[in-house]
Design a protein with these regions (language model features):
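Basic, Lys/Arg-rich alpha-helical nucleic-acid-recognition elements, primarily the DNA-binding modules
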Residues: 1-5, 39-42, 52, 71
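N-terminal leader segment of winged-helix/HTH proteins
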Residues: 1-31
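C-terminal regulatory/oligomerization modules of transcriptional regulators
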Residues: 1-8, 109-156
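N-terminal helix-turn-helix DNA-binding core of bacterial DNA-binding proteins
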Residues: 22-63
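Basic, amphipathic "hinge/linker" alpha-helix immediately C-terminal to the N-terminal HTH DNA-binding motif
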Residues: 32, 83-106
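Alpha-helical linker/hinge and terminal dimerization helices associated
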Residues: 37, 74, 103-114
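Canonical helix-turn-helix DNA-binding module
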Residues: 50-82, 86
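Short aromatic/hydrophobic contact patches that present stacked aromatics
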Residues: 56, 90-92, 122
Length: 156
């Protein structure tokens, strides 16, 4: 018996595991470690120097250095020199890193609701209201939920 070929509109759950394209698994290979996400949080807040990132995250220097190297190799952050003698670098988000902003907001929102008793911060939109991140289709404006998403093979 052979596995069914993906067809337009097929739901991912209907595909055998080996046939599922898994961008999520690939993203988790880059981002899925605690210290990576916490380092990205700090860099996104404007903390660019290694010692300050280590201080705010609580990561050991060895672990943080490893995670920053991996994030740089994946193109999520870049190092920029700020001192020649001794040579020192700052860390900045690349375009790929900046595009993680909505992902981080969604994780904050989930954590505020499900992972802590009382959130440490209230995030507000520029309109003054507490931030509520929703996902909507950019084409039709309708909410995106697990039952409104259909997958089809990417065109070659």
């Amino acid at each position: 018996m052979t596995d069914p070929e993906p067809r337009p509109g097929i739901r991912l759950a209907e595909l055998p595991l080996g046939a599922r394209p898994c961008s999520l698994a690939a993203a988790l290979d880059v981002l899925g470690e605690r210290w990576s996400l916490l380092a990205l949080r700090e860099i996104g807040y404007g903390v660019h120097r290694f010692a300050r990132i280590a201080g705010y995250t609580g990561a050991s220097r060895d672990i943080l250095a490893d995670r920053l190297r991996k994030l740089e190799a994946a193109g999520v952050i870049e190092r920029r020199p700020y001192s020649e003698h001794p040579p020192r670098h700052e860390y900045h988000l690349t375009e790929a890193g900046q595009e993680l902003f909505p992902v981080m907001l969604a994780l904050y929102q989930w954590g505020d609701r499900w992972a802590v008793d009382t959130p440490a911060l209230t995030r507000r939109h520029s309109c003054g209201q507490p931030l509520q991140v929703d996902q909507v289709c950019h084409h039709c404006g309708q909410p995106v939920t697990h039952d409104t998403i259909h997958a089809e093979p990417a065109s070659a």
